[in-house]
Amino acid sequence: MLFSSLTFVWFFLPALALIYYLAPGRKIKNAVLLIASLLFYSWGEPRYVALVLLSILFNYLFGLAIGKAGGRKGLRRAALAVCVGANLCLLGYFKYFNFFLELAYTVLGKEGFTPRNIALPIGISFYTFQAVSYIADIYRGVKPVQKHIFRLAMYISLFPQILSGPIVKYNELEPQIEGRRESISMHAYGIRRFVYGLAKKMVFANMFGQVVDRIWGLPLEQLGTAVVWFTILLYSLQIYYDFSG
């Protein structure tokens, strides 16, 4: 489910907003956001929701271990190294296993390399580095250990940034999970920002993208120097408005 899709704009977001504002108290509201985030993720990758939950549980337990280690630096460093290493190995397996396997075949002079069918889970880079940020912050003492697993789950899996980022440091987002301020003016500002971003994506980025695709589809002999430079300019604008939106 994309933020620019009709399903998100006309169904998911309005339903979430209604349920959120009807929910009493911060704990219930946070539970609504957490459930919505997992549903949002499962829309595109239902089989990998378990991987997100496993990542949350794993980093939660190692966070507790680092906290219980207290002043024992060696134990804290060992827990940090194992936790960060496991996170990066998981990410590396999905992203680079075939690359390193092919490299090994090449180095050993073997033939017949067949890539393994390993689907890359959506957003795994973002939620993995979010988890690493949490572990790094509590190791450095920037923030205390999060003893409430559901709050940590919100930080790692929050739907506005789990699919395409940005990666937000734990010490920046944690105060908003536990004690965020809300007002009509802030909600209105958020709606305006969302509408502006949606317009940049749907109107400008998509428009420039359609023109670029049509030009690149022309025969090579029809692509003069001026046309190529014009297309490069349009493509730059497409990328700008896509990321800006």
Predicted regions and their residues:
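Membrane-embedded transmembrane alpha-helical bundles that form the catalytic cores
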Residues: 1-244
